[in-house]
Amino acid sequence: MTRPRNTQPPKVQLRLYDAWLTICELSALTPGRGVAALLPDGRQAAVFRDRSGRTYAIDNRDPFSGAAVLSRGLTGSHQGRPFVASPLLKQRFDLESGRCLDDGTVTVTTYEVRTRPDSAHTD
């Protein structure tokens, strides 16, 4: 007898502390655009999918303005590294490291991201 294949759409998960939190279905992420996700502790994450299918997550709060807007920023790449530009003051943040490309003294939190089949719990 064969096991049925998992037909659930893949989910995007963020690592928070020692657990994985399901954020959304991968299909909800439009390449080149971000979405905001409310985290259990009240913070927000900005989640992105690039055109090659890679996913990234950083803190949604723009450290220069204090507004939760990075998920609405424009994405691009600089020297082969993906970034998002704040929609307010246009500072660019590396999506892999969180470092501000325009002011090396400023960073935003990054989150480890994975894509997995749907599950009823975090592990």
Regions found by a protein language model. Name each.
Residues 1-81, 94-95, 107-123:
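N-terminal pre-ligand scaffold of iron-sulfur
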Residues 62, 86-89:
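Short cysteine clusters
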